[in-house]
């Protein structure tokens, strides 16, 4: 049923995930909110749907939980025809594989465990945040004072030892007691917090 709805030209498909999740995988026809934090998602989606209150809206997310909350919010805001992908991308990927169907979702499904992603199709739709090469491998910077989540290709990973910059590579190579000083330095931590990838 969702497959038919997603292909309907009168349907607005909304990705209810943060940009770092959707940049590695998404439904082809989806509108992607350009937000980095979950708290900003609902206001942004409401803004995106302004003037389309009578459209059919389909929501999707990783496992379905965020869509439950979002659909209640949107219905309360006057958008009455809201549906969601039951079980999220996880269930969708399982179902299409089981039934041998072509996936309308391309790329990886970002997951919140050590894997940081489950491949749904072989498509790579994102690029390395450092050099622009095709890549969909999320990493946490190995400099624990930074620890930013970013996408890195294998060449940049090798060149920077899993760090997001030369500065972080230098810090990550220090003895652990020296690294701890950076973690405790609030000025350094605040500076890293606002790192923006070229993708964003």
Which stretches of residues belong to each language-model region?
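Conserved small/polar residues in nucleotide/adenosyl-binding loops
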Residues: 1-5
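Rhodanese-like catalytic fold shared by cysteine-dependent sulfurtransferases
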Residues: 8, 18-57, 65-200
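Short hydrophobic beta-strand that contains or immediately precedes a catalytic carboxylate
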Residues: 12-16
């Amino acid at each position: 049923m969702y497959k038919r709805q997603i292909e309907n030209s009168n349907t607005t498909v909304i990705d209810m995930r943060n940009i770092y999740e959707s940049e590695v995988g998404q439904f082809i026809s989806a509108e992607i909110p350009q937000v980095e934090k979950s708290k900003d998602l609902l206001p942004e989606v409401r803004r995106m749907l302004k003037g389309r209150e009578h459209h059919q809206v389909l929501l999707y997310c990783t496992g379905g939980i965020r869509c439950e909350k979002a659909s209640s919010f949107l219905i309360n805001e006057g958008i009455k025809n809201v549906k969601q992908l039951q079980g999220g991308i996880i269930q969708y990927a399982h179902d299409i594989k089981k039934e041998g169907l072509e996936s309308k979702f391309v790329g990886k499904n970002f997951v919140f465990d050590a894997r940081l992603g489950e491949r749904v199709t072989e498509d790579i739709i994102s690029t390395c945040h450092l050099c622009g090469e095709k890549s969909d491998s999320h990493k946490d910077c190995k400099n624990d004072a930074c620890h930013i989540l970013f996408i890195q290709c294998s060449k940049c990973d090798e060149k920077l030892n899993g760090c997001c910059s030369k500065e972080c590579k230098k810090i990550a190579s220090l003895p652990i007691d020296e690294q701890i000083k950076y973690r405790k330095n609030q000025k350094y931590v605040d500076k890293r917090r606002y790192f923006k990838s070229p993708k964003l």
